[in-house]
């Protein structure tokens, strides 16, 4: 066993850029300490270890951010805007009454951070940096959602928080843009955040709230069956099957298995999306993520119901490749994100996915 672990470690270090390997390995080590065998979680230690950063009242690298706490739900969101779009009074305070633009369309990206429903937050340094890069590179406004985490808050708490965030964003005059004064909303997230984005989009579809598109970065899906990628990649690139199982037990309702629709959206108990106006999707799959088969099954599920889906498959990418701009996968992702959020024309559903090759 020790020899196998050493082989996996050496292979991982050979493929993954050193800075990224160190970063994600540190997360992996901390996560292992925080999870308890009885299903509980050391939240106090997690908060101590999670490096957080405040919002910045002065633009940093052309991006301004501020926090908002909803007085009704107590939900915190962090809003990132290009400094060029800020409206300030002559006293320097924010003026949140004017739209972002009355001529140009400015996409608003509602972002759900990853962490397997359990780790990180909207003000975690690593996600703060990532959201800033989204603003700078893609020319969007980002609203990062500090949703409630498991195991203290199980299904469907994170989805409910995502739904509340969507409705709050849609009601903000100062997030409107374009000649028709709309809020042009996209949902996005990585890992568990991608799962949340999908489920919020399903609810938006059911309740007639318009979302222009979904962006899912190696979304966290699964099922009872063990897939080939789970067997082949178990423990090789940062994550084990046991890790994933622990997080699903911590998030799903007590007594549920991994074929619950929250985990397996197109599984035996999943909701059919056939004939509904579900938004177009960009699904990013890392070829070294052990749950990639479930992500590809998700793409196939969208395809079979006639929905528009773009698949960006990055064969040599691992989870978290986008945290640092030290690899070609990062730049490929940003290029595709930029194109996706700026192609807001309503398109007809397509019968097959578009495979994007880096």
Curated annotation (Swiss-Prot):
Places the protein is found: Nucleus
Description of the deletion phenotype: No visible phenotype under normal growth condition.
Disulfide-bonded cysteines: none
Active site: 191, 289
Amino-acid positions noted as binding gibberellin A4 in the UniProt annotation, renumbered to this chain: 115-116, 127, 191, 320
Enzyme class: hydrolase
Family: Belongs to the 'GDXG' lipolytic enzyme family.
Protein name as it appears in the record: Gibberellin receptor GID1B
Native source species: Arabidopsis thaliana (Mouse-ear cress)
Gene: GID1B
């Amino acid at each position: 066993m020790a020899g196998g672990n050493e082989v996996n470690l050496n292979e991982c270090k050979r493929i993954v850029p050193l800075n990224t390997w160190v970063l994600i390995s540190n997360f992996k080590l901390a996560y292992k300490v925080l999870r308890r065998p009885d299903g509980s979680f050391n939240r106090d230690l997690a908060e101590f270890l999670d490096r957080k950063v405040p919002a910045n009242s002065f633009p940093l690298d052309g991006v301004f951010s501020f926090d908002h706490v909803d007085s009704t739900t107590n939900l915190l969101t962090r809003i990132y805007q290009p400094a060029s779009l800020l409206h300030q009074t002559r006293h320097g305070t924010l003026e949140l009454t004017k739209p972002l633009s009355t001529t140009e369309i400015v996409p608003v990206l509602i972002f759900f951070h990853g962490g397997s429903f359990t780790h990180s937050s909207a003000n975690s340094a690593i996600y703060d940096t990532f959201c800033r890069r989204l603003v700078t590179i893609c020319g969007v406004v980002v609203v990062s959602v500090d949703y409630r985490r498991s195991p203290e808050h199980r299904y469907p708490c994170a989805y409910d928080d995502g739904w509340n965030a969507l409705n709050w964003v849609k009601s903000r005059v100062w997030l409107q843009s374009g000649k028709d004064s709309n809020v042009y909303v996209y949902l996005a997230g990585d890992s568990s955040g991608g799962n949340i984005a999908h489920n919020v989009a399903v609810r938006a579809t059911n309740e007639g709230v318009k979302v222009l598109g979904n962006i899912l970065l190696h979304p966290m899906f699964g099922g009872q069956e063990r897939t080939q990628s789970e067997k082949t990649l178990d423990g090789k690139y940062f994550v084990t099957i046991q890790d994933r199982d622990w997080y699903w037990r911590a998030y799903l309702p007590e007594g549920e298995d991994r074929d619950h629709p929250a985990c397996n959206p197109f599984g035996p108990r999943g909701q059919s999306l056939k004939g509904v106006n579900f938004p177009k999707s960009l699904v990013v799959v890392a070829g070294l993520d052990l749950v990639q088969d479930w992500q590809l099954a998700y793409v196939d599920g969208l395809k079979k119901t006639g929905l528009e889906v773009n698949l960006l498959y990055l064969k040599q990418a691992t989870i978290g490749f986008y945290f640092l701009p030290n690899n070609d996968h990062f730049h490929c992702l940003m290029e595709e994100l930029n194109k996706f959020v700026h192609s807001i024309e309503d398109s007809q559903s397509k019968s097959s996915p578009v495979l994007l090759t880096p």
